[in-house]
């Protein structure tokens, strides 16, 4: 047999078993590719997670820094508001409230706890003001008073001697002797003027001292009597001498500019002179419900008129209403110290039934009790028998009202 005859009976090896070797090769290749793709996919997923976490961290850091800046700006705004409202020391205010809360609320009629030393310090303020007006020099020695009066007596004696020397005592006096006498009298007058100048210097020192009202009035009467004597003597010598004229002028200007000082401890009202202007000052000690006109229904404040005799004949007071007996221009002032939890407090000064002055305070804080004062004042022309009274804007507002306190008061004096 030849090859050609055997060719139909021979089949290729790849065609046996339905192509099994080719299928196995493709499956292995696919598995190999799948195994290679799994790490790549996992790597991409991990990289994405890292990028997301990094982005989230950056965003969170930026957000925190922005919030920190906003917090700092808010703190600055709060600090500025505290400075404007004057509440930088809230802790100290809280301590003050804890210390005086019971005294201000539970015992409203208890006398204010001011010691005698504090009262003396208040009186010292008047003396210090008077001393400052006189070049800030204080003279408190009583011996200088006696020395000043001795100098004044010596000056009067010299004036009498000078007047006697200028009066002719003998009809036989020659003209030459007359010229000698006139020259000597002129020299004496010069000495008298120097002595009077030194007396004025001592007198200014004496005016700086604190004296009682009775001593000042007695001294003023003595000076007026001496002033009359000096005026008569200077008028007799005016035609021949030049020194008495300026002496009389200095004396008149000195008496014109005299002013009275108040001794420590005396009331301003009791220390006034006879020609002083009427004045009255009240410490607000109580209140009562009052229904007024014009829609004002607040409580009326009543003052403690312990100085009744000081303004008798000028003012009349009854149930918190002050009546003026003399027509004129008056200065009215008032202050109330509030201690409550309200944000707004205030009062009105009425002229009759018409509001004249108004005071309103706003304290927007979170403190349980807010202690603050409200003060107002002004000028007003009042006719005879016109009335002035003080009334709160609201009802039942807790205020510091006690006998002898210096926080709530009301006053008036004639200008």
Curated annotation (Swiss-Prot):
**What ranges does the record list as Low complexity composition bias?**
164-173, 181-196
* Post-translational modification comment from the UniProt entry: N-glycosylated. The soluble form derives from the membrane form by proteolytic processing. Proteolytically cleaved from the surface of fat body cells by the cell surface metalloprotease tace for release into the hemolymph.
Outcome after substituting residue 394 to A: Abolishes binding to grnd
Q: Where is the composition biased (Acidic residues)?
A: 114-137
Give the coiled coil ranges.
Answer: 203-233
Q: Which parts pass through the membrane?
A: 38-58
Effect noted on mutating residue 339 to A: Does not affect binding to grnd
Q: Which cysteine residues pair off into disulfide bonds? A: 359-374
Query: Which parts of the sequence are marked as the site Cleavage?
Result: 145-146
Q: What induces it?
A: By gamma-radiation. By bacterial infection in the gut. By aging.
Q: Which InterPro entries match?
A: TNF_CS, TNF_dom, TNF_Ligand_Superfamily, Tumour_necrosis_fac-like_dom
Question: Which parts of the sequence belong to the THD domain?
Answer: 278-415
Is this entry keyworded Lipid biosynthesis?
A: no
Which tissues is it found in, per the record?
Expressed in the fat body. Expression progressively increases with age in gut progenitor cells. Expressed in tumor associated hemocytes.
Q: Which family does it belong to?
A: Belongs to the tumor necrosis factor family.
Q: What does this protein do?
A: Cytokine which acts as a ligand for wgn. Also acts as a ligand for grnd. Induces apoptosis by triggering JNK signaling. Together with grnd, involved in egr-dependent apoptosis in wing imaginal discs during development. Required for JNK-dependent non-autonomous apoptosis through release from apoptotic cells and activation of apoptosis in neighboring cells. Required for JNK-independent damage-induced apoptosis in the embryonic central nervous system through regulation of the pro-apoptotic gene hid. Involved in the innate immune response to extracellular pathogens.
Anything else the record notes? Named 'eiger' in memory of mountaineers killed climbing the Nordwand or 'wall of death' on the Eiger mountain in Switzerland.
Protein name per its UniProtKB record: Tumor necrosis factor family member eiger
């Amino acid at each position: 047999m030849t090859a050609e005859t055997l060719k139909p009976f021979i089949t290729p090896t790849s065609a046996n078993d339905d192509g099994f070797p080719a299928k196995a090769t493709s499956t292995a290749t696919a598995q190999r590719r799948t195994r290679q793709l799994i790490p790549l996919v996992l790597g991409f997923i991990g990289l994405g997670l890292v990028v997301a976490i990094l982005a989230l961290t950056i965003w969170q850091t930026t957000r925190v820094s922005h919030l920190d800046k906003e917090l700092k700006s808010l703190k600055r705004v709060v600090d500025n508001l505290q400075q404007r409202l004057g509440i930088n020391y809230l802790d100290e205010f809280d301590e003050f409230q804890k210390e005086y809360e019971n005294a201000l609320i539970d015992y409203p009629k208890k006398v204010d706890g001011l010691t005698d030393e504090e009262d003396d310090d208040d009186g010292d303020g008047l003396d210090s003001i008077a001393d400052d007006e006189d070049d800030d020099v204080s003279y408190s020695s009583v011996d200088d008073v006696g020395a000043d009066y001795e100098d004044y007596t010596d000056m009067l004696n010299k004036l009498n001697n000078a007047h006697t020397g200028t009066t002719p005592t003998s009809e036989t006096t020659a003209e030459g002797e007359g010229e000698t006498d006139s020259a000597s009298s002129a020299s004496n007058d010069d000495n008298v003027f120097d002595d009077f100048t030194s007396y004025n210097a001592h007198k200014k020192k004496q005016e700086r001292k604190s004296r009682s009202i009775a001593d000042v009035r007695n001294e003023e009467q003595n000076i007026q009597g001496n002033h009359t004597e000096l005026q008569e003597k200077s008028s007799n010598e005016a035609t021949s001498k030049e020194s008495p004229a300026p002496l009389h002028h200095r004396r008149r200007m000195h008496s014109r500019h005299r002013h009275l000082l108040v001794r420590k401890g005396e009331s301003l009202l009791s220390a006034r002179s006879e020609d002083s202007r009427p004045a009255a000052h009240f410490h607000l000690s109580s209140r009562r419900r009052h229904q007024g006109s014009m829609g004002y229904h607040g409580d009326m404040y009543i003052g403690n008129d312990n100085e009744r005799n000081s303004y008798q004949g000028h003012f009349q007071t009854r149930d918190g209403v002050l009546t003026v007996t003399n027509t004129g221009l008056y200065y009215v002032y008032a202050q109330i110290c509030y201690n409550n939890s309200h944000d707004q407090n205030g009062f009105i000064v009425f002229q009759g039934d018409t509001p004249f002055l108004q005071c309103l305070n706003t304290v927007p804080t979170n403190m349980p009790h807010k202690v603050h004062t409200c003060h107002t004042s002004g000028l007003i022309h009042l006719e005879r028998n016109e009335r002035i009274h003080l009334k709160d804007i609201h009802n039942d507002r807790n205020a510091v009202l006690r006998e002898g306190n210096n926080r709530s008061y009301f006053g008036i004096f004639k200008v």
